[in-house]
Amino acid sequence: MGIKTLIWLSILVVGIYCEISDEDAPVHYCFVNPPPKTRLSPNLLQNITTCTHLVYGSIPIDRDTGYPQYSVSDVESGYDIDNIRTFMRLRKYHPNAKLLMGVVRTKPFEDAATSVKVANGLRSHVKSKRFDGLFVTFNGIHLEYRASTSFLETISKDKKMSLTFGVTGRRVFAFDALRRLQEINDLVEYIYLDMGELPSNEELARVTHINPLFYNGSIPFEETIQGTVEELSKEGILPSRIVVGLTAGGWKFEIKETQDPLKISHGQYAENNGKRVSYQDACRARGAVIYDWQTMNEITVYRQTWMSVNLPTIKAMGEKMKWILGQKFAGIGISHALFDDPRGDCGTDPLPAHRLVMELIRNTIPANPAKCTRLCYLDPEEVEETFPIDNLKSDYCSHIVVPYFALDLSDKMIEEDKAEDLVKKIDDWRSKIVEVAPRLILSVGSKQASTIWQFLLGNDFHRKELAEGLVKAINSTNADGLEISWTSQPMVSDFDKKNLKSFINDIVAADTAKMVEIVVATSQQSAYSDFYDYEHLNKTASLIVLHSHRLHSDSLPFTGHPSPLRATSSMTNQKMSWESLLSHWVEKRVLPSKLVLSLSASTLSMQSLADVRSSAATPFGQSAFVSMLRSKKGDIHSQQEICESLKSGTGVTHWVDGAEVPYLRRYDQMVAYENTRSAHIKAVWASMEGVGGLALHNMHQDDPSAVCDNRTAFPILNALSRAQVCQTCLKQHDFKKCEQHDFVVSCNFELKRSTPVFKTDIVPYERCTEVVVEQATLTLGGNVNFNDVQQEQVVKNLTSLRSKMVKCGMVLSLSCGDSEKYLNSILGDNMTFAIGNVMNIMEKYKFSGVQLDCEKVIRRGNHIYFNTFVKKLAQKFESGKASNGCNRTLSARFSHYTQKPSTYYSVSLLNRLSHIALRMTDKHSVDLPFFFNHTKPEFPSTEKFVNIWKNVGLKPDKLVLELSPFGWQTGKKVGEKKKMTQGVNCVTAGNRAVYEHDYETLTGMTKHENGTINMPMIEDFRYKIGYIQREQLGGIALNVNGDDYTGICGRGSFPILKSVYSSHKCR
């Protein structure tokens, strides 16, 4: 047979190179698998610019040396073809893509040692060929054995090598496959789910649809894309770890003469084995065409031929792709290019399926809704055409506000310059994330002088005409609302106040359909002059935006900051702070939930009268040139310019305590600005105050191209979205009912001698969904014992309260000992006896549940024992009710020391438990930092470990965060800490001690004669509960021994626990 030479037509497409650099963007796997003796075209995938992973071949690796078994055309041979070398030239067109060698192992590994040997040999060879990594597939029963994990584990040790594991839908449901995939999940970059082969394909003569999306009556649910990925998700393999592989072309079957081709269905037997057909062959097939809207496939029937084809159009294969992207899978793959009409024989552009993926990925932005109210302002006069709006994450903004209408004396209103173009750009971006797109608000009058406002609003006819025109204009666009912004200059009289009120009423009257959201922007000058009708705004405006980002101006003859949190002593006007402005509006009885506080991504540059670059003088209140008397040529305007000044060493940044803001000194220039730290603090403070939302003005200055760290676009918005929470009021549960609680409040009660005053009869069970009693121990032989007689007596006392606790759970915390060998002995030889003893002690002391606290003794050697123990114990629990008549509960407790949960635990099993408690404390029982620190990524934090557990597949509503009420007093030695309860703190520092709040550590700090005390405050707990609600976690756990259970602090007993349900700042 001679050499086949395939000459691909040049693909003439005008387009912009799309670099997939966003870590959240979908990946695109592109496969090239040329048959033997076929020459690969070097420009085959030249214009498919979204390929992030290029995979060559499906090369056998059945030799135990690991050396790939190449075909005659893979590498240079007598045929003068070296397709691998040609493939490597694709790097020219895809400089950011990873080039992977595709390998397949059919022969099972004899043992783990063989798998390691094969892996090492293969890894060395792949490096010699200069591939970036491997795409590994097993064609056989390999997933039944752990040697397959050893093979991938050995390859994964090379951190420079990219590794993808491919598994077909057919193999997912094989024996032990899901367990093996859980182990593999942490070893690879992605798991590639190839839906080209299904369980039905075990018998090649069975009629099979190609990549069916949904169940259609004849297709088993587990053979659909939806069913397969749901099974993986249940086992803790999240969509974000899965690339869904689709197939170019389809399946072709010759059916029996006795069968009606129009009535044939998935799973029936054909006359002969099915054949895979390329799209270029399928598109030329004759016959009747039927479209199946469940499988999203085209069915072609001609005589006794039946064919299921992936039709590469937006309404067919595109629906599968849109579903995959909409479900937030890691990405899509198409196998393979040579089956995807590479020459355009079907009359369309070549590679139609690949082009469809490219189009959808380019038009897809990973979409999540904003979890709190955040207004993002873009000024059409300031925003350049190249503004990278696609870098804006969908959850950063709940509203986008554009100054759109200018007021005009003759025409009433006109469009701002470039406003229409900007709105079109925003609309295009919103169309990519339709379901969770931010609301679009068009602003009127933000740049007009008060005289124009007074003229138009002072005349009843002009005012009503303006209101009707604005509502009509809003309804003619895709906008959702209108912002009324009389803010460029302040109002000057009560007439202005009256006319603004009438104008709002006219807009409400003109909006007969009640579709226009009304936002009112306010200035600090008008507010402090009481030129707003506060009661009227409370009733009519959905949001009231305070211009708290304009509290200082460069037109003033002294230095200052546009948005200090609090006033400093040197500030000329003590009212010009966030704290004072918010207090003013709240004192006027405006609902805090309606108020939006503003900050800006832009800077305020001022020129001091002397060179104060190295001066330690108070930064605010110094004499400065007013803006009209100085040149602004060298001013810093944006976040990226701040970064450039700091990197070059021309500027030095300083921090102002109290005001909680930074400023930069550059010779005689002072630049006041916001950074991620100040934005974080403002977001936490505003959240604690129950403020309705935050607004970021001049968003285009917030480093939209990630110049500062080459990682985070819009860093201030990112900081706001991470730190802002929106508290909703928690309804106290009814402890007299056995209902499933939406929010768990787990009260941990310690059995120890150090708290003799804590009598069992004051345990606040009515405020707890469960009381967790700490702690009994599982001992050798499978017995359950308390540490001493006194502890057991305390348990007996609690049991006597059981009737009063009614349906409130009483849960036994059960330790598994102190060593791995200890647990091995218990569960290896006495598991059944241990389970029986757990049930006996529950019955004896009327416990309704058990919380397993076994983390420190779980290792690779015994984790299977533990998972089996949990599974059998859960089955026992399900067989009956607890002593209080409710379902028994089984939970588990872990800490930040478990950094790879899926290595030791069955995530699917944990998802079936009542909940998982996360203990995030140090050795002093003090909470670890709450937020992840990007500068110290190795440092533990609550945010980091919540994400770790969510990323391995634990359901968010199963996660219960333990919040510590303990604080600490600094000791005499460096680093020494003395743990303190809330009550001891009040005794030590006194009830009247004043605490300085730290919005980063979420503690209060006070100094007294014996040292410094740091204590978590009630506001901190309320904030953390807001975070838990925002992330839709399961609830909180609180050690009630650390709360002020005696009421010595003057706020009644258990003030922290009671604050869970009572706060005037929630909504």
UniProtKB/Swiss-Prot annotation:
**Residue positions with a glycan:** N47, N216, N475, N538, N710, N797, N830, N887, N933, N1010
Instruction: Cite a single Pfam family from the UniProt record.
Output: Glyco_hydro_18
Q: What broad class describes the main subcellular location of this protein? A: secreted
**GH18 domain mapped to chain residues:** 26-364, 372-727, 743-1067
Annotated SUPFAM superfamilies:
(Trans)glycosidases (SSF51445)
Q: What is its EC number?
A: 3.2.1.-
- Localization per record: Secreted
Q: Which residues form the active site?
A: E855 (proton donor)
Picking any one GO biological process from the record gives: polysaccharide catabolic process
Enzyme kind, highest EC tier: hydrolase
Q: Which UniProt keyword terms apply here?
A: Carbohydrate metabolism, Chitin degradation, Disulfide bond, Glycoprotein, Glycosidase, Hydrolase, Polysaccharide degradation, Secreted, Signal
What the entry lists under InterPro entries is as follows:
Chitinase_II/V-like_cat, Chitinase_insertion_sf, Glyco_hydro18_cat, Glycoside_hydrolase_SF, Glycosyl_Hydrlase_18
| Cysteine pairs bridged by disulfides in the record | C30-C51, C376-C397, C747-C768
User: Any idea which GO molecular function terms this record carries?
Assistant: chitin binding; chitinase activity
Assigned GO CC terms = extracellular region
* Biological role stated in the UniProt entry: Putative chitinase.
Provide the family line: Belongs to the glycosyl hydrolase 18 family.
Give the protein's recorded name. Chitinase-like protein C25A8.4
Question: What gene is it encoded by?
Answer: cht-3
